[in-house]
Design a protein with these regions (language model features):
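Gly/Ser-rich catalytic/binding loops embedded in alpha/beta enzyme cores
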Residues: 32-206
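Membrane transport/envelope proteins' first extracytoplasmic loop
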Residues: 17-18
């Protein structure tokens, strides 16, 4: 399998903001016999943040079109195909945020290098929006923090689009050291995109 095909399996956004890690082994787990994702081309899967900014500056892409592409990619890889379970939930306001940032770019120019760039953040990073923050647990299901975390606040100020909450090892491994890496009650078992019968290792598995 070549590098482009590997990248095509794993890409869902241009940047992923993660916190924390844990030095545990990548043990195999019992996985359903899903076929890998199709080889249909995904135009943005190797794009860097600089590439995306250049594309928006030239008019080739907009924040909305990029966001739509990554939402479709999440659906293709998490909801169908290999079912990576890398994402716990997506932001229902992502497209309206993208539209507002496109309008701002037209009227004032970009705020900076993250303007209009979709990012996914770990599910233990507070966001005050229509997404919940649960550390992957059912105990906190439905929990909406009263304010953004410092990280989320700074991302929004920079013009980034908080696209989704990434799956993680529940409670960032505080539920037990023998727990499977990348498993949470809300997200299920996150799968290693390079070897679908193995886990992705670490707390920040999504």
């Amino acid at each position: 399998m070549n590098r482009r095909r590997f990248l095509g399996y794993t890409a869902f956004g241009s940047a992923t903001v993660l916190s924390g890690s844990a030095p545990f082994g990548c043990a195999p787990f019992e996985a359903p016999g899903d076929a890998p994702a199709s080889d249909e081309p995904f135009e943005l899967h190797e794009a860097t943040v600089a590439d995306l900014q250049a594309g928006m500056e030239s008019g080739r892409w907009t924040a909305r079109s990029i966001t739509e592409a990554y939402l479709a990619r999440i659906d293709a890889l998490d909801g169908r195909g290999p079912e990576l379970r890398s994402i716990i939930e997506t932001n229902p306001e992502a497209l309206s945020i993208a539209d507002a940032l496109d309008a701002e770019r037209r009227s004032k120019g970009p705020r900076g290098p993250l303007h209009g760039i979709p990012v996914a953040i770990k599910d233990n990073i507070d966001t005050h929006d229509r997404m919940t923050t649960t550390a992957g647990s059912l105990a906190l299901e439905g929990s909406i923090p009263p304010r953004d975390s410092f990280l989320a606040e700074k991302l929004r100020e920079a013009g980034a689009i908080i696209l989704a909450k990434a799956n993680m090892s529940e409670w960032a491994y505080w539920r037990g050291l023998k727990a499977s890496s990348g498993w949470s009650a809300r997200g299920g078992q996150c799968r290693n995109p390079y070897a679908l019968d193995r886990n992705p290792c670490g707390s920040s598995s999504g």
